[in-house]
């Protein structure tokens, strides 16, 4: 049986570039090689595509390497002399693209739309679901409308609202949590106990972003739970996994807590009781379906007084060997090689 040729897109132009490189190392090593020929395509922070020219591409171990060191080793191993134009991947015979990207243009619908234009199927959600999930403000409006608990929130838009006036006259009380509306992986996020602290955070975010989400801080147990879809004939059967409780050693599960070894404790399955687990599974499945996600997703919650409040849904969650979805799949006896096969089969269907 001939193998299906796929591209594994990784790296990218977002602040989560290095996380994508780590995730994709695991993806590359895990995809079923009896079914698929995998070609890793590196996208550098400037958006240049580095496409291997050898018949059996190699993905170097990124551990302990700088971006430059990794790229040099990647290019040497794969006989790459210079970057290609992005559209060149349409001439390489790829039948699908596995998205190992995270955040920014890799997760907000832009790369999805680009691949759609080239006629290359891809894993994960489409343009609309990706952009809606990345837009935390509009996603919250949808979640709230569908009866999923959401902490009080509002949005500040640069040049459109007076942030200082708004922060001094909030309809809900401090402390609040502040993050870029279109951000990911807890980059540039923080807690503010006063309007002045909030303004400092907003000013920092406005340097690089135009929209800021301000949300009432809900204290409680932080959990995250994934959804997978299993292809059955022509249908996709979505089902929830088990929740993971996250206990950061810092005040919040920020970027460092997520991706620094030992910076947080993750317990899978989360010890939150059967009733709360069932509610989390119901809510995460509903979030997945409300946004129109495809293949997989992961939704984060805070449990306060027994009530799970949704924080956000991620359409391209982390996929290192120790990331949350692999943990949750393992707890249910699901092999990640099978998961990646499901994602590719769905993309090709």
UniProtKB/Swiss-Prot annotation:
The keyword Metal-binding applies. Its EC number is 6.3.2.4. Mg(2+) 1 binds at residues 300, 312. Disulfide bonds: none annotated. It catalyses: 2 D-alanine + ATP = D-alanyl-D-alanine + ADP + phosphate + H(+). One of its GO terms (cellular component) is cytoplasm. InterPro entries: ATP-grasp, ATP_grasp_subdomain_1, D-Ala_lig_Van_CS, D_ala_D_ala, Dala_Dala_lig_C, Dala_Dala_lig_N, PreATP-grasp_dom_sf. GO terms for molecular function: ATP binding; D-alanine-D-alanine ligase activity; metal ion binding. Binds 2 magnesium or manganese ions per subunit. Keywords: ATP-binding, Cell shape, Cell wall biogenesis/degradation, Cytoplasm, Ligase, Magnesium, Manganese, Metal-binding, Nucleotide-binding, Peptidoglycan synthesis. The keyword Nucleotide-binding applies. Pathway: Cell wall biogenesis; peptidoglycan biosynthesis. ATP binds at residues 169-224. Its cofactor is Mg(2+); Mn(2+). HAMAP family: Dala_Dala_lig (MF_00047). NCBIfam families: D_ala_D_alaTIGR, PRK01372.1, PRK14572.1. This is D-alanine--D-alanine ligase.
């Amino acid at each position: 049986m001939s193998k299906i040729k796929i591209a594994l897109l990784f790296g990218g132009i977002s602040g989560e570039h290095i996380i994508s490189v780590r995730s994709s190392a695991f993806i590359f090593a895990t995809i079923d090689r009896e079914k698929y020929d995998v070609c890793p395509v590196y996208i550098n922070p400037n958006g240049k595509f580095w496409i291997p020219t050898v018949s059996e591409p190699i993905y170097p171990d990124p551990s302990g390497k700088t971006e430059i060191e990794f790229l040099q080793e990647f290019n040497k191993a794969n006989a790459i002399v210079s970057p290609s134009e992005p559209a060149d991947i349409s001439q390489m015979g790829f039948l699908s693209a596995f998205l190992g990207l995270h955040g920014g243009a890799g997760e907000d619908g832009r790369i999805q739309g680009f691949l759609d234009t080239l006629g290359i199927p891809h894993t994960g959600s489409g343009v609309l679901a990706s952009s809606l999930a990345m837009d935390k403000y509009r996603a919250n409006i949808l979640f709230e409308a569908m009866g999923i608990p959401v902490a009080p929130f509002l949005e500040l838009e640069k040049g459109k609202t007076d942030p200082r006036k708004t922060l001094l006259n909030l309809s809900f009380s401090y402390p609040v949590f502040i993050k870029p509306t279109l951000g990911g992986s807890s980059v540039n996020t923080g807690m503010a106990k006063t309007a002045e602290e909030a303004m400092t955070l907003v000013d920092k975010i406005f340097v690089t972003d135009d929209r800021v989400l301000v949300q009432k801080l809900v204290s409680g147990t932080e959990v995250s739970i994934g959804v997978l879809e299993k292809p059955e004939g022509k249908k996709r059967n979505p089902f929830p996994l088990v929740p993971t409780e996250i206990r950061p050693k810092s005040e919040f599960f920020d970027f460092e807590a997520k991706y620094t070894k030992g910076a947080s404790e993750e317990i899978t399955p989360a010890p939150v009781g059967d009733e709360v687990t069932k509610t989390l599974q119901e809510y995460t499945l509903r979030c997945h379906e409300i946004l129109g996600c495809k293949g997989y997703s992961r939704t984060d919650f805070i449990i306060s007084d027994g009530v799970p409040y949704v924080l956000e849904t991620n359409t391209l969650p982390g996929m290192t060997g120790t990331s949350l979805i692999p943990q949750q799949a393992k707890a249910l006896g699901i092999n990640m090689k099978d998961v990646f096969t499901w994602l590719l089969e769905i993309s090709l269907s």
